Amino acid sequence: MIMAVLMMLCPDIYASAKKAEESPAVQVLTSSKNARKLEGGMLKLARPALKKTPMAVVMDDIDMMVMYSISQKADEEEKQFAQQAINVLEKYNKVSEIDDPDYRMSIYIDNPVGENFSEIILYISRPDPSIMVFVGNFTIGSLKKVGEISDQRRMERRQAKR
């Protein structure tokens, strides 16, 4: 229901799950500069009632904090799927320190409770966890693609420094 409303309100900004790989929102995951630029135009969701259990905190070498969590309402199968997605994201993110909290963004994995376990919904939260910005819904496959793009950019930056 929430997804349907979001897609109706913002059809030009948010791609459907089928087009997640081509979505501009995917790039938000690899560049916090883009995320800051897009934040003003994204739909902010007040979700103070969300009860989530933090699973891992990882920071990449740009300046984005990534916090993964799984809904407490998720059953075992859903938790396993969400954990798979977390593992994919962790593989492509390195831990680093950021002093300025204004540049920190949390990305929540919200595995929807229901029949479809093949996609997850991502939100960016900054700085108040009760106010989230919808990014899009992705499959594990598209997250792998995002990770590979991020990994490739890291290699390019390292070579440029030499």
Task: Annotate each language-model stretch with its function.
Residues 1-22:
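Bacterial Sec-dependent N-terminal signal peptides
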Residues 15-17, 45-50, 154-162:
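Glycine- and aromatic-enriched low-complexity segments, predominantly in secreted/extracellular proteins
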Residues 19-80:
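Early exported N-terminus immediately downstream of N-terminal targeting peptides
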Residues 22, 136-162:
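C-terminal partner/receptor-binding element of secreted or periplasmic proteins
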Residues 59-64, 92, 116-118:
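A broad structural signal for short, well-ordered beta-strand segments within beta-sheet-rich domains
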Residues 64-107:
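Mature extracytoplasmic domains of secretory-pathway proteins
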Residues 108-143:
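A short, solvent-exposed beta-edge/loop patch
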